[in-house]
């Protein structure tokens, strides 16, 4: 019994000794900075293990920072940074299990069963996909990353304080992204970078769409929180919203900007209480005026993609300078998806398999997708996969509305639900199912949070 009690201390001591040996070795062999870097990384890892909420949000924002980290630290060219965070996330979930607090709530059973069936279809589709290389990579990313991001919130969000703490982490990361983006814009302006044909501002070299998608979610958070404030706090939130809209416009990404407005409108119609609905309409109208003001006030290099929606963009290709319409390309991709789905009876049910969309093009086995989550699932998982996806959405919406009818959503729950709706609309115009896996994360957080709201109200009235 004594030996059993001292085992954790002994293992911890051996672990510290091993870390010291590795630190000294790498500090001598590689660079003296390792003497400081390794202890910091160890402490950061331990901190993340104890805070799976922050780790999960970091995974959601990896599309912004991953490229920069790979460029600065070549080791992450081999070691996937997202996979490393997933391992840390599961270490945090394992810690919860060891403390006896592990468990998936009973109310999640239906949606988790549907999600498991959908994952099974995704896996099986890899055996008949015409694009095995890109297909299996896509399957692996979805089963490892998306599944972890969907299941984790159901485990670690156990009370309202957990949801509030996660919202505070989200605020911190959002503020960091916004400040970094505004500093980058200031640098572009002062260095003469605006005097070109087209500027699509980004952050750390990330895809502007990924940055804009994150900013749209941040805008939804600021809007939902701002209308619940009074006096100067509401005015401050409006100023922050204007800065976020400036950052979104500067990315040149039209889809996330439209998704922000679509998500807020649907949130107002379905979930917002009558107390704040009029305020949300007012803020929405002001936001539209801010966007139009930015489009007329900013340099043409930043607003070109918004002003030339029907004409398309002038780009340099292997065949020379061409004008390409993103909207026309998207519509063509959707048409190809529908035609492929209806091309034969077997395709109608199970279709191409994961990654199969690229088989319609000359490169065949390549990461390519129709930029719409429904058309993507319809083509690659067939009617069966499409029905499973629709059923998942129906179960989630039914539960959201059920809890909404029982009382007003809390501030933190409103943020998560609004973020889910914004990403849902964004998934209809850009990215594939892996690019939009953050949708599953926000959906799980939103469902967990409103369940905690409901349980809290029941405990008060009991």
Regions found by a protein language model. Name each.
Residues 174, 372, 398-429, 443-445:
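Loop-to-helix entry and N-terminal half of a specific, functionally important transmembrane alpha helix
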Residues 2-8, 13-21, 40-45, 116-127, ...:
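Alpha-helical transmembrane segments of multi-pass inner-membrane proteins
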Residues 48-54, 93-113, 164, 225-239, ...:
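Membrane-interface helix-loop-helix junctions at transmembrane boundaries of multi-pass membrane enzymes
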Residues 80-87, 110-122, 132-155, 168, ...:
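Aromatic-anchored transmembrane helix interface
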Residues 2-96, 121-128:
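N-terminal signal-anchor transmembrane segment
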Residues 194-195, 202-204, 318-381:
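Long extracytoplasmic/lumenal interhelical loops at the membrane interface
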Residues 1-16, 229, 234, 402-413, ...:
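A juxtamembrane structural motif centered on a specific transmembrane helix
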Residues 3-4, 182-188, 250, 271-320, ...:
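A membrane-periplasm/extracellular boundary helix in multi-pass inner-membrane enzymes
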């Amino acid at each position: 019994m004594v030996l059993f009690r001292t085992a954790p201390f002994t293992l911890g001591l051996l672990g510290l000794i091993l870390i010291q040996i590795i630190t000294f070795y790498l500090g001598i062999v590689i660079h003296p900075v390792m003497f400081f870097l390794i202890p910091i990384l160890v402490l950061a890892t331990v901190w993340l293990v104890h805070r799976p909420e922050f780790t999960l949000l970091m995974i959601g924002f990896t599309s912004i920072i991953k490229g920069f980290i790979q460029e600065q630290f070549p080791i992450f060219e081999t070691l996937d940074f997202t996979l490393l965070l997933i391992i840390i996330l599961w270490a945090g979930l394992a810690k919860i299990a060891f403390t006896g607090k592990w468990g998936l709530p009973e109310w999640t059973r239906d949606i988790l069963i549907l999600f498991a069936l959908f994952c099974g279809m995704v896996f099986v589709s890899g055996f008949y996909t015409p694009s095995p290389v890109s297909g299996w990579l896509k399957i692996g990313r979805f089963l490892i990353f998306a599944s972890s991001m969907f299941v984790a919130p159901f485990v670690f969000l156990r009370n309202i304080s957990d949801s509030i703490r996660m919202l505070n982490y989200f605020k911190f990361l959002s503020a960091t992204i916004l400040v970094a983006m505004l500093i980058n814009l200031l640098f572009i302006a002062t260095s003469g970078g605006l005097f070109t044909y087209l500027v699509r501002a980004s952050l750390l070299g990330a895809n502007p769409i990924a940055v804009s998608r994150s900013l749209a979610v941040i805008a939804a958070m600021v809007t939902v929180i701002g209308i619940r404030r009074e006096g100067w706090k509401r005015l401050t939130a409006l100023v922050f919203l204007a800065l976020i809209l400036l950052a979104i416009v500067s990315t040149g990404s039209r889809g996330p900007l439209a998704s922000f407005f679509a998500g807020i409108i649907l949130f107002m119609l379905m979930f917002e209480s009558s107390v704040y609905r009029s305020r949300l309409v007012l803020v929405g109208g002001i936001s539209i005026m801010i966007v139009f003001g930015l489009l007329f006030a900013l340099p043409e290099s930043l607003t070109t993609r918004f002003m030339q929606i029907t004409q398309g963009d002038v780009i340099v290709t292997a065949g020379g300078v061409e004008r390409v319409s993103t909207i026309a390309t998207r519509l063509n991709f959707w048409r190809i998806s529908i035609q492929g789905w209806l091309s034969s009876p077997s395709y109608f049910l199970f279709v191409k398999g994961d990654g199969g969309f690229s088989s319609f093009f000359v490169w065949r086995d390549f990461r390519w997708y129709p930029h719409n989550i429904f058309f993507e699932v319809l083509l690659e998982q067939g009617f069966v996969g499409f029905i499973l996806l629709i059923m998942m959405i129906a179960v989630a919406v039914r539960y959201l509305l059920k809890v909404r009818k029982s009382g007003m959503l809390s501030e933190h729950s409103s943020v998560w639900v609004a973020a889910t709706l914004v990403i849902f609309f964004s998934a209809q115009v850009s990215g594939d199912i892996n690019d939009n896996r953050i949708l599953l994360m926000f959906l799980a957080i939103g469902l967990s949070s409103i369940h905690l709201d409901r349980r809290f109200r029941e405990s008060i009235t009991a």
